[in-house]
């Protein structure tokens, strides 16, 4: 299993990759986020050089392996989290008192919606 500095990757469509840069500390069951970004595949591959990458998407994993092995990118195909996994993680956070008040939550919109991108300009 991946540990230390890990990039989590999801196919974002349009030739882009959602990339989360995390520090995994399995001995304390903690994860620290460094960044979450939307990158072109080229930017992602450059950023992933020498790092571990995890993804639940087989096609993305194969694409990264095909071009990333020479760059020292290690890819691990992981299971896609299901609702039971999400519930367990949420429960663990609640038990540790790691909660956020609803008014303190911040939405993380990484890119504009298709409607915003493809809408006709106002006249």
Task: Describe the predicted segments one by one.
Residues 121-123:
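Short, low-complexity, intrinsically disordered N-terminal peptides in bacterial proteins
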Residues 78-107:
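Glycine-rich phosphate-binding/hydrolytic loop that grips phosphoryl groups
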Residues 1-82, 109, 114, 119:
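Surface "functional belts" at beta-alpha junctions
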């Amino acid at each position: 299993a991946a540990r230390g500095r890990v990039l989590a990757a999801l196919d974002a469509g349009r030739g882009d990759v959602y990339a989360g840069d995390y520090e995994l500390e399995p001995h304390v069951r903690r994860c620290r986020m460094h960044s979450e970004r939307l990158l072109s595949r080229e930017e992602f591959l450059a950023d992933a050089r020498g790092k571990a990458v995890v993804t639940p998407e087989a096609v993305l994993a194969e694409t990264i392996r095909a071009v990333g092995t020479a760059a020292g990118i290690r890819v691990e195909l992981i299971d896609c989290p299901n609702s039971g996994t999400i519930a367990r993680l949420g429960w663990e956070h609640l038990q540790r008192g790691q909660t956020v008040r609803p008014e303190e939550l911040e939405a993380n919109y990484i890119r504009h919606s298709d409607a915003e991108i493809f809408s006709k300009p106002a006249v």
